[in-house]
Design a protein with these regions (language model features):
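Terminal leader/tail segments of proteins
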Residues: 1-131
Length: 131
């Protein structure tokens, strides 16, 4: 990861979540990864995938709440009421996170009882080109 990619990933996450305080820096434990933070909170890792000649990134964030409060938790955390959690067709173990009409990520249950979730966001190199 170079400085330009880190800056673009940071801007992409800031725009996506509507949270200008998100920061992205190199992961001190893994030189091939970055880590996203929001204030003092570590949001999660950003992993590089450059298989097949296409460079993409995967952002994962653990969410320590149950399904009924997912939307409110994310809205409060990012101070953005435009974030909405929407059920997926024929899927009961995951939901979608949108900002307005824009799809952001899939949020999947970590266990069958849905006590905790993981947000998974794919970021393609094409997503970063305009930043």
């Amino acid at each position: 990861l170079n400085k330009s990619e880190l800056r673009k990933l940071q801007e992409f996450l800031r725009v996506s979540f509507g949270a200008p305080a998100i920061k992205v820096g190199l992961d001190p434990k893994n030189e091939d990864a970055a880590v996203a933070t929001y204030g003092e909170r570590v949001l999660g890792p950003i992993i590089v995938d450059d298989e097949d000649g296409d460079r993409s990134f995967s952002f994962a964030m653990k969410i320590p709440v149950e399904r009924p409060v997912l939307q409110e938790y994310l809205r409060r955390m990012f101070e953005n009421d435009d974030l909405t959690v929407i059920a997926r067709a024929r899927k009961t173990d995951s939901v979608e996170l949108n900002r307005g009409d824009d799809f952001l990520a899939v949020i999947s249950a970590d266990d069958p009882k849905g006590k905790t979730y993981t947000l998974q966001m794919a970021i393609l190199d094409i997503d970063l080109e305009e930043l």
